[in-house]
């Protein structure tokens, strides 16, 4: 009888110990996830405030065929910030060429002093610099624009922070991925109404509250990306929608869609941006209460 009693006591202790260990694992996992999201949030701010980020943008000027003058004078086609001379220069578009002329010397590619420069629409990797400013030509669809940056932009507040929903692990959802045939593209528009083409890669499907939802994914450079709107769009979250990245599917076609990492388009932070508009297929009739909230 004594042996049986001790056995029961041992079993009870083992059960409690296992429970504590499992509980400890659960807490550890939650803490690891919180650390992961904290790193994600810090990296977001670092990226936005970097030289290649969007907080330093101070101008966006769409280039038409022919000659356009720029400078601080309001009479110019492109009005630059007040620190620039009244008539600073011009850009002339002739077919597939851009001809820049300046009344003061500027730095080409942060290295060579120039007062004029010509390049083709296939060579958009050149930059021009003057004091704290830098500008270059970007292409969106079939349209071209001068994008102007100020690396001393006062909008780059050291206290800059992005508001988020509280972390909710239930919004880290296991879904399935159905790939499109290779080479499939889709055409959507940006906020200016310009058509833009994106490589569409497939459909991500998942369940929320027992209901099935799906979103079309595309490639953004090397990243698998989803852009979407939902019931919070325009209220608690940015009016233009949000996006998120996801990893490659496993061997069974499973993916993880983590809405806690849903982030705002650059347009939520700066007016001089050219964000895409999520296609109708990616407008969810559900409130995604996770990830970044509207920036004010």
Where are these regions (language model features)?
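A short, structured loop/turn motif at beta-sheet edges
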Residues: 248-254
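Surface-exposed beta-loop interaction hotspot
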Residues: 131-196
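Flexible, glycine-rich surface segments
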Residues: 174-232, 238
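N-terminal cleavable signal peptides for secretion/export
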Residues: 27-78
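C-terminal motif of bacterial Sec signal peptides marking the signal peptidase cleavage site
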Residues: 23-24
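Bacterial N-terminal signal peptides that target proteins for export
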Residues: 2-14
């Amino acid at each position: 009888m004594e042996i049986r009693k001790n056995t029961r006591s041992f079993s009870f202790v083992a059960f409690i110990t296992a429970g504590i260990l499992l509980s400890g694992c659960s807490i550890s996992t939650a803490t690891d996830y919180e650390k992961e999201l904290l790193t994600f949030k810090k990296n977001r701010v670092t990226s936005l405030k970097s030289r290649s980020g969007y907080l330093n943008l101070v101008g966006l000027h769409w280039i038409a065929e022919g000659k356009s003058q720029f400078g601080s004078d309001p009479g110019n086609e492109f009005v630059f910030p007040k620190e620039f001379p009244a008539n600073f220069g011009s850009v002339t578009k002739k077919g597939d060429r851009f001809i820049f002329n300046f009344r003061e010397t500027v730095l080409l590619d942060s290295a060579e002093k120039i007062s004029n420069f010509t390049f083709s629409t296939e060579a958009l990797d050149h930059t021009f610099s003057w004091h704290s400013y830098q500008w270059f030509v970007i292409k969106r669809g079939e349209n071209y624009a001068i994008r102007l940056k100020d690396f001393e932009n006062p909008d780059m507040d050291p206290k800059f922070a992005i508001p988020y929903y509280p972390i909710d692990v239930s919004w880290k959802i296991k879904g399935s991925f159905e790939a499109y045939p290779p080479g499939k593209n889709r055409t959507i528009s940006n906020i200016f109404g310009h058509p833009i083409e994106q490589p569409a890669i497939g459909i991500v499907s998942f369940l929320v509250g027992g209901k099935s939802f799906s979103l079309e994914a595309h490639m953004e450079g090397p990243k698998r990306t989803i852009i979407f709107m939902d019931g919070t769009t325009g209220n608690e979250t940015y009016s233009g929608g949000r996006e998120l990245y996801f990893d490659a599917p496993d061997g069974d076609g499973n993916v993880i869609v983590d809405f806690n990492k849903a982030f705002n388009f650059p347009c939520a932070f700066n007016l001089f941006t050219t964000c895409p508009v999520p296609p109708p297929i990616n407008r969810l009739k559900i409130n995604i209460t996770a990830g970044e909230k509207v920036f004010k």
